[in-house]
Curated annotation (Swiss-Prot):
Keywords: Coiled coil, Differentiation, DNA-binding, Nucleus, Transcription, Transcription regulation. Pfam families: SRF-TF. Signal peptide: none annotated. The gene is mef2A. One of its GO terms (cellular component) is nucleus. It comes from Dictyostelium discoideum. This is Transcription factor mef2A. The lineage of its organism: Eukaryota, Amoebozoa, Evosea, Eumycetozoa, Dictyostelia. Transcription factor that regulates cell differentiation during development. Seems to negatively regulate prestalk gene expression and positively regulate prespore gene expression. Residues 97-110 have a biased composition (Acidic residues). Residues 249-304 form a coiled coil.
Length: 1048
């Protein structure tokens, strides 16, 4: 027997409705409370009664829950409506009375996130955990483009601060979207590159001032912000570039909360200022007492004879106030800093004390798992005025991603904060160089009203020999520095051997006198007086050095030290360089990319010993982007410069990695890093141009086999007609994936960034894994070479050192082919014709280049792709090669929404629409990159990889693929953006890539041309001397680019 269930329908009697509501309301709220506790979920329940009374329950603050879970930018979370419940529970009458239907709707309704963090990605006011996750997704997702796609969604969901992450993912979006968009925007954000170069500088500062990255991030989260900054750097570029639209849109979500937080910050900053003034008074009193003591010791010294000075120093080791002129300067600085502090109040930035905790910041802001998004103290606001200076405790040290440097992925340098680099020793325990202190490797800083450093002049008592007047500068080197009671000041005294700081981004050549000095400060190229000063500081008498160090301790109140270091460590140095030696600035910007990532490692990190090449080598745009990217361009660097940096980071990281642009440019140089390597020669190599151009140009004409590609796309207005395309695989260029391995090798930073810059660099190709997949595609042809590099469709036939294709080189059974190895049809040219105007027909003719081996020729493979049918005309009396179908899965290319990756990696993965993303595991990426290293040895095969890695825009000219997305083997309609027009010149065809290759002399042109090439096929085609009509190529590109842009 069972009770009869009440029919779920409206109670007709009004009184009964009132009674039922009263009874069940309390039970409903009780169940909601129990559910929130049992399942550790957040519940906000609002019940409206019939008499307009509001009953609500919330496991946390109601308003924040509503904002977090209701204001979603997209439908990543399944929202159940009343219709869903009615659908499940509305048919109870048809069921038996004995059935227990309580759980009937569990499966039908599906699961919704139950944990408090389940929907963080949907949180518009993204918390640091979201940012970290998205950044990790970006870092991890750089290995996985799918994750990048998800990150795009997640970051878009996280918007606000994940706007930056959104731009991280939009960096991945910029890498992917910008490789999709910035494939129009790599190509366009090659505008972004040029803009990123500008945005690199502008967006650098804009991020410091305008980017809402970390506006709600607590100090303990600041070390986590670096990844966000990497993305946020791109966000700045993205904000400055196309991403700024989404970022601005996303940023609009929590604007009111930010305004409220700003007001709170102003109030609290005023309180902090009052506390600071009180402490300042105490400090002045103490300073006065110390000054009196100093005078007493000086009087004693005068009575002690010629040796009294040294004796005085021994007496003053624990009491060493500064000389009066230096004291006046510091007082002037203090007044400047106090003015800056007044200005900070207007910018809602509280003061951070030596322990890294804000004076204004309640403990709940750091204790809350959500980071309390409205916390007034943020790394962005702090970095805006540089409040935090060097005062973070070891776990919070603002460390610029040295790992990111080569890629320009020091994007985290937006806030100058990043997670500690992997390969750095004790960097967490070391303080960044104090540029505004005599012992910090620099001179006292003077700030203007906005907190930026004014041009520095040596102090009046500054001795040209490196010391101050009255100091013995010719005394022997200092002993071990004295340990002070203040551990943070002690860290400042310790030699700092970390490269991750901003000045480490400049080329070691300019710093060589100072780089490995005892002081260890990798400061930016210095004014000659600074260099003398830094070199002689440690040559002064040991006691003098201790005296100066203690003067720093006594003169600077613990808070004063922070305020004196208000400048963002990177902005501070960046503007010092602009002001001190503008004539050297471009040179440094051209060079520091190559070198900065080598600061803590041997110059042969790329196994290319000339990495520290002459300053002229780096392409100015790439370098400027790198400089902008590395300096603040790192801010831009990641994504729009990862869009740019996809070209630029690829160019920048490709400076060492210069994967797409430079390596495509480098494709001549067998060292993939050849921008860096070419740069190594201290020259911009036309070899890149020659090898790129020469790859196609120098290579002998190869046998082209007309292949008919039948492609089903009834509704693809984006594909113009093109009569046929042939695959030219010949190229000398070092495959991009020396860059991958160069990325992995070039920069362990890039390896750190490899997830970002290897992948971001590969993200130029949208080839995080596509780089690996480009590697994979490269590895596919590596089957030709080492069964690792699958270069373009068949083989790089030209001057590559790799063996030509022969039946023995091809494993028809493909067991040795790793999942990452996927045969790829790379560059497509109109049937070997010099060319006709780019036209795409539904039936495309794919011609496969077969290299000549001796006097014998191997016939083309007969291969069919689904839906691309490749029919190779069989030549009589020639043995046939294995069919590429042996290597291909059934690939359905969806040119409208998504393209699917083959099931090598466990199934089909949806990727953003556009060319097929060949994503793989990081392990396969490593192996692929190693394969690419093999391909690096097999430079020529990898040259096609350059094209492969090149997103068409960054495609190395030698690369056979015209696939702008760099996704070889993906002939989706969107992949043909650059299947154009000057396919004749594969060098030129990758147009942007060719420009890169051609413009390897000018990687700016490579990036700009890649960017402009992507932006303007006219430029690329024109620059590439493509025969295609620039107007038509432009139009076709615009049509393609529009089709490639992700739909909101």
């Amino acid at each position: 027997m069972g009770r009869n269930k009440i029919t779920i329908e409206k109670i007709s009697n009004e009184r009964n409705r009132q009674a039922t509501f009263t009874k069940r309301k309390n039970g409903l709220i009780k169940k909601a409370m129990e559910l929130s506790i049992l399942c550790d979920c957040e519940i906000a329940m609002i019940v409206f009664s019939s008499n307009n009374k509001l009953f609500q329950y919330s496991s946390r603050d109601m308003d924040k829950l509503l904002i977090r879970y209701t204001d979603n930018t997209d439908n990543t979370r399944k929202n159940l409506t009343n219709q869903d419940y009615n659908r499940v529970f509305g048919n109870k009458k048809s069921k038996n009375d004995d059935e227990d239907g309580d759980d009937d709707g569990d499966e039908d309704l599906g699961e919704t996130p139950t944990t408090p963090h389940g929907n963080l990605n949907a949180h518009p006011i993204g918390s640091m955990e979201n940012n970290n996750n998205n950044n990790n997704n970006n870092n991890n997702n750089n290995n996985n483009n799918n994750n990048n796609i998800n990150n795009n969604n997640n970051n878009n969901n996280n918007s606000h601060h994940n706007n930056n992450n959104g731009n991280n993912n939009n960096n991945n979006n910029n890498n992917n979207n910008n490789n999709s968009n910035n494939n129009s925007n790599n190509n366009n954000s090659n505008n972004g590159n040029s803009n990123n170069n500008n945005n690199g500088n502008n967006a650098n500062h804009n991020m410091h001032h305008h980017n809402g990255n970390s506006a709600n991030i607590s100090p303990m989260q600041m070390s986590q912000q670096a990844n966000n900054n990497n993305s946020n750097n791109n966000n700045n570029n993205g904000n400055n570039n196309s991403n700024s639209n989404s970022n601005n849109n996303n940023n609009s979500n929590g604007y009111q909360q930010q305004q409220q937080a700003a007001q709170q910050a102003v109030q609290q900053a005023q309180m902090a200022q009052q506390m600071h003034l009180q402490q300042q008074q105490q400090y002045q009193q103490l300073q006065h007492i110390q000054q009196q003591q100093q005078q007493q010791h000086q009087q004693q010294q005068q009575n002690m004879g010629p040796n009294g000075y040294n004796h005085q120093q021994q007496q003053l080791q624990h009491q060493s106030p500064p000389p009066p002129p230096q004291q006046q300067q510091q007082q002037m600085q203090h007044s400047q800093q106090q003015q800056n502090m007044n200005g900070i109040i207007g910018h809602h930035s509280p003061v951070i004390v030596g322990n890294g905790v804000s004076l204004l910041q309640p403990s709940k802001w750091s204790a809350s798992p959500y980071g309390e998004d409205l916390a007034p103290l943020t790394p962005r606001s702090a970095s805006y005025k540089g409040i935090y200076g060097n005062q973070y405790p070891p776990q919070m040290q603002p460390v610029v991603n040295s790992n990111n440097n080569s890629n320009g992925n020091s994007n985290s340098m937006n806030n100058g904060i990043s997670s500690p680099p992997i390969n750095q020793q004790n960097q967490q325990n070391q303080k960044p160089p104090i540029m505004n202190k005599p012992g910090g490797g620099g001179q006292p800083m003077y700030y203007d009203y906005n907190g930026y450093p004014q041009q520095q002049q040596p102090p009046q008592n500054y001795n040209s020999n490196g010391g101050y007047w009255g100091q013995n500068v010719s005394s022997p080197p200092p002993p071990q520095q004295q340990q002070s009671a203040n551990p943070y000041i002690q860290q400042q005294q310790q030699p700092q051997h970390q490269s991750p700081y901003y000045h480490g981004n400049y080329s070691p050549q300019q710093q060589s006198p100072v780089l490995n000095s005892q002081n260890g400060h990798h400061s930016s190229p210095m004014h000659p007086h600074q260099m003398h000063h830094q070199q002689h500081q440690h040559q002064q008498h040991p006691q003098m050095q201790q005296q100066q160090q203690q003067q720093q301790q006594h003169q600077q109140h613990p808070q004063m030290q922070q305020i004196q270091q208000q400048q963002h460590p990177q902005m501070q140095q960046h503007q010092q360089h602009q002001q001190q030696h503008p004539q050297m600035q471009q040179q440094h910007m051209n060079n520091h990319q190559i070198n900065h990532h080598h600061l803590n490692s041997s110059p042969e990190i790329n196994s290319q010993k000339n990495v520290h090449s002459s300053p002229l080598i780096m392409n100015s745009n790439n370098n400027n982007n790198n400089n902008n990217n590395n300096h603040h361009g790192n801010d831009n660097n990641n994504n729009n410069n990862n869009n740019s940096n996809n070209n630029n980071n690829n160019n920048n990281s490709n400076n060492n990695n210069n994967i797409n642009n430079n390596i495509n440019s480098n494709s001549n140089n067998n060292s993939n890093v050849n921008n860096g390597n070419n740069n190594n020669s201290g020259k911009v190599y036309n070899n890149n141009n020659n090898s790129n151009n020469g790859n196609n140009n120098n290579n002998k004409p190869e046998q082209t086999i007309p292949v008919k590609i039948e492609k089903e796309h009834s509704s693809s207005p984006t594909i113009p007609e093109q009569p046929s395309i042939n695959v030219s695989t010949s190229s000398n260029s070092a495959h991009v994936f020396n860059n991958i391995t160069s990325n992995s090798n070039n920069n362990n930073n890039n390896n750190n960034n490899n997830n970002n810059n290897n992948n971001n660099t590969n993200n130029n190709n949208n080839n995080n894994n596509n780089n690996n997949n480009n590697n994979n595609t490269n590895n596919i042809n590596s089957n030709n070479n080492s069964s690792n590099t699958n270069v373009n469709v068949i083989n790089n036939s030209s001057s590559s050192s790799t063996p030509p294709i022969s039946p023995a080189n091809i494993n028809t059974q493909s067991p040795a082919i790793s999942p990452a190895l996927v045969p790829v049809v790379t560059s497509l040219n109109p049937q070997g014709e010099e060319t006709s105007k780019p036209k795409f027909k539904k039936s495309l003719n794919l011609s496969i280049v077969i290299p000549e081996v001796g006097n014998s020729k191997y016939p083309p493979p007969q291969c069919k792709l689904t839906p691309i049918n490749v029919e190779a005309t069989k030549q009589p009396d020639i043995p046939t090669l294995p069919s590429p179908r042996d290597f291909y899965p059934e690939i359905n290319l969806h040119h409208d929404n998504v393209s699917l990756t083959p099931n090598y990696w466990g199934g089909w993965h949806q990727t953003p629409r556009g060319s097929l993303l060949l994503t793989g595991n990081g392990g396969s990426n490593n192996s692929n990159s190693s394969n690419n290293n093999n391909n690096n040895n097999n430079n020529n095969n990898n040259t096609n990889n350059n094209n492969i890695s090149g997103n068409g825009s960054s495609s190395s000219s030698s690369s056979s693929t015209q696939n702008p997305n760099g996704f070889l083997g993906c002939l989706s309609p969107r992949s043909f953006n650059f299947l154009n027009e000057n396919n004749n010149n594969n060098n030129n065809n990758s147009s942007s890539g060719n420009n890169n290759n051609n413009n390897n002399n000018n990687n700016n042109n490579n990036n700009n041309n890649n960017n402009n090439n992507n932006n303007n096929n006219n430029n690329n085609n024109n620059n590439n001397n493509n025969n295609s009509n620039p107007d038509e190529s432009d139009q076709s590109f615009n049509r393609k680019r529009k089709s490639m842009e992700p739909k909101n």
